[in-house]
Amino acid sequence: MMITADLIWDENLDNDCEVSKDIWEDDTFIDKSYLKVVLPSYDGVDTPIVYHFKLNDDLKINSIKIPTNSIGNLGKFGRLNTCSLEAVSGEPPVLKEIIIKIDERLYDKLALLPKANEKKQYFQIKYNLVNKQSVIHEGNIWGHVCEVVETKPFSQGVIDFSVTDIVLIRSKILSVENKHDRSLVNLQAFHDLSRIPLKCLHYPVERSLLLPEPPFDDDDSIYVFFPFDLLSKLKISSGSFVRLSNSKNSVLVRAFLLQSPNHYAVDGIYTTPFVLAQFDELPLVEVEPVYNNELAFPTASEVVISKVGNVLHTQKRYQELILQKLRYYFLTARRILSNGSLIPITIDSSFDEIILEDIDLDVNTIKSDDDCIVWFVVSNRKFENISNYDPKAEFFVDPKHTKLITSAMENRSLSSNTFNSALKYYGLPGVFHYRPDIFPVVNDIKNVINTHAEANKKVPNLPMILNLSSNVPKVGKASILRSIAIDLSYQFVDIDTLSVVFSSGSSDIATTFLGYLKGKLENLLPFTGNTIILIKHIDHILKKVDQNQDIQQSRQVKALEGDLISFIKSYSRIYPGVVFAFTSASIDNLPEGFRSEIKFDYVVHPPNEKQRRSIIDELLSTSDLFQKYGNRKLRIQCSNEIEISTLSLHSAGLSPYDIQYIISLAVADSLRKCNNYLLWRQNKIKVDMISIQNALEKVRSDYSASIGAPSIPNVTWDDVGGLSSVKDAIMETIDLPLKHPELFGSGLKKRSGILFYGPPGTGKTLLAKAIATNFSLNFFSVKGPELLNMYIGESEANVRRVFQKARDAKPCVIFFDEVDSVAPKRGNQGDSGGVMDRIVSQLLAELDGMSSDGDGVFIIGATNRPDLLDEALLRPGRFDKLIYLGIADTREKQANIMRALTRKFKVSSDINFDELVSDFPFSYTGADFYALCSDAMLKAMTRISKEIDEKVDKYNQDNGTSISIRYWFDHVCSDEDTDVIVKKEDFLNANKELIPSVSQQELEHYKQIRANFEDSK
């Protein structure tokens, strides 16, 4: 049971807390040694802090004294003075590891201590740490020089000096005085009191943090929170009214102290989206005191509220819900407004008028998850018995006496800062911010839209049509445009052609679709100003059709094409600020007439490694990650061991949607693992690297077929035996460009193609996979028949798609197995149409492109017959590195191959592979050695099975029973009975039965081919 107590901070306490006598004698605290303290939080997440507690008879009734060193972001003034307490049953867990950041001078002194136990003794004595009693928390600050940055496996627990490891990090850190006095550190942020930064709160503030507590019907939308030092400097008391003003606007607000501890930077004042919206364009304000005689506002008898142009306001199914939410906003408080005040209202778009028909009008009874915001603006007001009231002055809205009237829409735009801040404040789904320096396509589209806006001022009625195409689904085309619309303060309208219902057999698609468009836009565009209209999947209804094959469909497409172009030109004349954007799989799918109207076409590829790193970094931002768990809100944190660079590398080829799904799976997995220890994790869920890797593997396995995501094989150099001589050539070709790309920035062309040739079974494919694994490269394996297609031009298109996928997934290896079947000598093929010659030509063109835009893409070919390859493939810049992979021609190589193949075997201890291979012929390939080892394992298993039969028979004879083999396995046998140990005799017997796959005559032929190639190079 939680109780509320007065809170006293003490800088002299070390680790334990002290309670007053009445709490000590409370029934719930008797026979308990630990309690948890919950401080009111500005982010809505309760953070329980567990202390070992003791009695202090001198404390006043119902009070607790806690050490200041247990809170890392505690200011020196304006601290919280109340908290909640609850006794903790049981004993705290023992921490396995404590990571402490300490001042470099102390670190150097402790480094001189020869034993780890001596370092532990220092902390035990210096900071009064009691073994198995003192609770250590993340964020603890000891003395002037130590800060606990992480504890494992929990966020708090006791230290056991015989078990707990202490890890020290050498660092320059602030002294405890400065650490506890963030306001003094940032005092100069307010050197100009006429330009104080106005920022938005991250979350609504609970009433327990308001000092003094205001009336229940107080207008909470005008609260502004000030750091202690700024309140003191302005000589303002917490809870008083002040006026924020600048050259644009003036707003009456109520000032409150931003109590410590809190997570806000002390470089501004923090308010609600309502106040921030009034200073939308210039959030720098001056603060002026307001006296009581200035607060005698009249109550309006009638207020007219207009809708701010938004697509939700035009949809009838949301009107009742929006009005209910607006009514509830005014019923819950006595609002203070003025002409022009912008009012944000959140709604759940999953509700509609059909659902609301049977629901009470009190919207508070509806349990919903709001997901979007609509805005209103005060456009007029009337008073009884007052005729000449200042148009800019404030007034009260009393739900009992004020009549509310909603009118038509008005054209207002909000800055991206206000829009995004409001989304975060209300906990609504945000929009990913694409940084223009990392996503060039975003910068290009922004420049085009801005140029169009400037050109429209000089030459109006210029239509602007964009197309974003990608053959990869959910690559982020719509989210890119939505992000741009927010950044440029454009309205955004999203229309999906897949959601348009056409009647079966309808012959007039144009009329249906254009009617749908007009219904969406004609009531919206007059009130929105600059607007991006996105029509998704336009190639679903407007696709290129051969009129000779389907005359009826061709006529429909022609009609829709002409009507849509006329519609766009007409609306561009009426509404000059409109930008029409389309998405499609490829612009080539669209009719030529419509394509000619598209001013700019952008191909959106899956994000590259740098872009994926940016996406993952933002998705893992700890300030935005929260999870609802029952009635509680949990904070999601990322473990320090997470390597974003590794994740960005291994997520090659995945779309932003897939990456977001990976993070959500990892959070869910971490929550499952942590939900039994939430108290000791302080309601924090740490997402570790293992959870993210498991989620990544799951997404890859689930979606690789549909999205074509390449994967990284799990083959290491240890799996490759006898090929160490070729590693240097591979390192030169692949490792050098990856680690030192600057060496190739001066025009020096890098090698990107390697050709493995030699007898079959010598490890060409295995070596290619080992390269991909060793350098963390993605791996595409291409077979010749996969590229062939019966339609003219499609085979060459397949080659282009393979290379484009590789560029999207770089760093990547494209492996052409049996490349002689893909690129034989041109002119020698008897196929009709010369398809193989065209494939070779396309392959040559793509290989030549690797030296320009193919950084990070490497081509590996493997063939048994290099003499059949087109000679152009072997010229510099293509497959210019030829590596012969022959048989193991020394005993050392043969022994290395045997060790690699039996790495996961249990072999007899008396086996010496150097001696074992002494009788093997030099005609064995790697595949032959693999067959030999597999056969030896099979013989060992056969031998073990016979031994088990004998053991069962002996057991039955000795015990007079007749048990089955299954019963013997389940109840009698030991692990040693079932261990399959491969003995020397198994290898020798397998060798006797093995026939080499390559004859001596064939080996001589391959040696001759090698000699010919080496002489010609």
From Swiss-Prot:
Residues bound to ATP: 758-765
UniProt keyword list: ATP-binding, Cytoplasm, Hydrolase, Membrane, Nucleotide-binding, Peroxisome, Peroxisome biogenesis
Pfam family, one: N1_PEX6
Record-annotated disulphide pairs: none
SMART domains attached to this UniProt entry: AAA
Entry-linked InterPro entries: AAA+_ATPase, AAA_ATPase_domain, ATPase_AAA_core, ATPase_AAA_CS, P-loop_NTPase, PEX6_4th_dom, RecA-like_PEX6_r2
Catalyzed reactions: ATP + H2O = ADP + phosphate + H(+)
Keyword Cytoplasm: yes
GO (cellular component) term, any one: cytosol
Location(s), subcellular: Cytoplasm, Cytosol; Peroxisome membrane
Membrane topology recorded in Swiss-Prot or TrEMBL: Peripheral membrane protein
GO biological process assignments: fatty acid metabolic process; protein import into peroxisome matrix, receptor recycling; protein targeting to peroxisome; protein unfolding
E.C. numbers: 3.6.4.-
SUPFAM superfamilies named in the record: P-loop containing nucleoside triphosphate hydrolases
Molecular function GO labels: ATP binding; ATP hydrolysis activity; protein heterodimerization activity; protein transporter activity
Family to which this protein belongs: Belongs to the AAA ATPase family.
Subunit description: Interacts with PEX1; forming the PEX1-PEX6 AAA ATPase complex, which is composed of a heterohexamer formed by a trimer of PEX1-PEX6 dimers.
Function description: Component of the PEX1-PEX6 AAA ATPase complex, a protein dislocase complex that mediates the ATP-dependent extraction of the PEX5 receptor from peroxisomal membranes, an essential step for PEX5 recycling. Specifically recognizes PEX5 monoubiquitinated at 'Cys-6', and pulls it out of the peroxisome lumen through the PEX2-PEX10-PEX12 retrotranslocation channel. Extraction by the PEX1-PEX6 AAA ATPase complex is accompanied by unfolding of the TPR repeats and release of bound cargo from PEX5.
Entry protein name: Peroxisomal ATPase PEX6
Organism expressing this protein natively: Candida glabrata (strain ATCC 2001 / BCRC 20586 / JCM 3761 / NBRC 0622 / NRRL Y-65 / CBS 138)
Lineage: Eukaryota, Fungi, Dikarya, Ascomycota, Saccharomycotina
